[in-house]
Amino acid sequence: MPELLVFPAQTDLHEHPLYRAGHLILQDRASCLPAMLLDPRQAPMSWMPVPPQAIKTSHLAALLKNQGKIFAFDLDARRLASMATLLAWAGVSCCELAEEDFLAVSPLDPRYREVHYVLLDPSCSGSGMPSRQLEEPGAGTPSPVRLHALAGFQQRALCHALTFPSLQRLVYSMCSLCQEENEDMVQDALQQNPGAFRLAPALPARPHRGLSTFPGAEHCLRASPKTTLSGGFFVAVIERVEMPTSASQAKASAPERTPSPAPKRKKRAKSCSRCLHTALHIAEAPGSLLPGGKGRCLSSPWKTLGPHRRQQFAF
């Protein structure tokens, strides 16, 4: 990740002038993975981080070079106002904030029909966050009741995100170490959409993979304080399965039909063929990503956001 600077774990840069000026932002290295794995540099399309988080949204905007469109939703007006302030401080101008419930957003809404990428980071137990475990003893092992409630919301959010018609790639991320919130959620979503989506290998060179709970779980990625010297994190990259890219391919896979001799019927069939060709042509969005280093890191994504920003600094 060339936009990141890595520092020793105990480095305190909160008072550094570059940080205070908005040129740099403190971020756990593992939390940088979702935006990178979404691979937004492929094309300036429409993006949707759910729920909106200033750090991850800013990272997306930087990778997009402030192009395209990012939609972010939150029902809490105060959180949205705070996020708007932070995004403005970072120089982000391609994000549109909406005080809406993501689960109530219609995938057929003209505003969101062309959303191609979704970064889904719903509420979770936070069992992978070392700071929470220090502040709340026992936070690393949430109760079954709380896990069940969280998993229900995560399942609804993930399944809803997969219904957007133009979706090409979704990154599901959790700052949790619990299988119920991680591998189980991904397996359930794939089972509910058989043949429509698949897991893409996330940084296959990295040794720390998803738990072997279902075939393909090794494509998921895990991080933890013990294994990667970072916060605990889970990431899965879900891609839409490619459909035929031409009307002839689609016709070959469809049941054979006897054409009608009526001229009008022939004309309608030709028109439908053109529509089918357009609907089935889906652009690929392959990713080529490299693992980061060890330790705490400082993200400097805003160097690409405007002429008033500075280049990346090393210490």
Curated annotation (Swiss-Prot):
UniProt region (Disordered), positions on chain: 245-269
Active site: 175 (nucleophile)
Disulfide cross-links: none
GO MF term set: RNA binding; RNA methyltransferase activity; S-adenosylmethionine-dependent methyltransferase activity
Gene Ontology BP terms: RNA methylation; RNA processing
EC number(s) reported in the record: 2.1.1.-
Keywords noted in UniProt: Methyltransferase, RNA-binding, S-adenosyl-L-methionine, Transferase, Williams-Beuren syndrome
Pfam families: Methyltr_RsmB-F, NSUN5_fdxn-like
Expressing tissues: Ubiquitous.
Name of the top EC class for this enzyme: transferase
InterPro entries, A to Z: MeTrfase_RsmB-F_NOP2_cat, MeTrfase_RsmB-F_NOP2_dom, NSUN5_7_fdxn-like, RCMT, SAM-dependent_MTases_sf
Function: May have S-adenosyl-L-methionine-dependent methyl-transferase activity.
Family from the record: Belongs to the class I-like SAM-binding methyltransferase superfamily. RsmB/NOP family.
Illness: NSUN5C is located in the Williams-Beuren syndrome (WBS) critical region. WBS results from a hemizygous deletion of several genes on chromosome 7q11.23, thought to arise as a consequence of unequal crossing over between highly homologous low-copy repeat sequences flanking the deleted region.
Protein name (database record): Putative methyltransferase NSUN5C
UniProt source species: Homo sapiens
